[in-house]
Amino acid sequence: MKKLIISLAILFATSLLFAQMTSIPIAKLETLHSTIVGEDYKLQISLPYPFNPENNKYPVLFYLDAFSTSGGMNEFAKMQMVTKNLEQFVMVGISYNTNPRAYVKLRVRDYIPPINKTDTIHGGDKFLSFIKTELIPYMETNYGTDPNDRGLLGFSYGGLFTTWAFKKEPELFKRLAIISPSLWYGEDEFILKNPAFLKNVKNTQNLKVFIAYGSLENPHFGESSTKLYDVLKTNNNIQVSKVIFEDEDHGSVWNAATTRALFTLYGDPFKALIKESNRFNDAKKYKQALESYELAFKKYPEQTDEWDKYDIACIYAQTGDTDNAFKYLQMLVDSKKDRYEHTLNDSDLNSLHSDSRWVTLLNAFKKGNKE
């Protein structure tokens, strides 16, 4: 009965949440012409709910490659804001009014900085000027975004651009998400060993940076990301984190990395790890699920609860690691939490039934329930 009541309560709360979510537009589509670049940019503007610009100045996150990546990230961020797992902020995806073939050429033009003064192919400098002098003022005027709290998120060439933007305009953004950056472009001297970049790293007072890449990507991505992380770590005023996503390649790392990036920059990092583990578990990627859970337990032990211990025990049971499964279930026994019925009937724990410790565990739960 207790399990039924809990399930109904969760179902009711979830139904209310989704009913609320269906009435909230995911993103507004607008077009902003840039006289600097000579391009009409399509903006995908996702607003927090409720949105009260008269009374609030909202942090804003600009993200690149919105042509192909916006939908899922906007929906995820919107739901996490409604459930208060993320702070309220505005998201602005920068895209193009074009077709996929032209999009590839345009991102090369905009995201790659000119390698020297004779480089007329790459226009990263003009694109950065568009963001600084046209897009940012537009958002501050029309949506009340906070001029002191801007973020930038980029992937691949976009990650290169995000890093380079810090080199050129160190005060423009306070939060950076750099995913699988193409920092091999121009070799280390172009950014990582550039005197202007190193000077900005040394003098920065307040910056939060998230760096990520997949373990199955070309080694260049991991090597350059690690070099970037090591340079940023030299300044204690820069909060920098680096995550390697196991079994993810250049085509798949985006979804995992953006989820963690949003939580790292705008949310509770413990909740980020737990939700990430749940996502991996649902996809039956148990190795990655356990890595996220164990990291959460290690870094934030005071935030873990009984259900977290129960969930990780179930994942270990599904992988055949009975020792760790019993270890976490025993923690529940020690905390004297009533989990007897739930443990007895959970099919995720079926692999433990033949173990001699199973009966002992159930008896311990029964004894704890009577105390």
Predicted ranges, named:
Residues 343-371:
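Terminal, low-structured helical/coil segments at or just beyond the last alpha-helical repeat
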Residues 1-24, 371:
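Bacterial Sec-dependent N-terminal signal peptides
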Residues 288, 324, 357-360:
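Alpha-helical positions within canonical tetratricopeptide repeat
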Residues 20-280, 286-306, 315-319, 331, ...:
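Non-catalytic cap/lid and distal C-terminal segments of serine-dependent acyl enzymes
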Residues 300, 320-321, 351-356:
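Alpha-helix capping and inter-helical loop/turn segments
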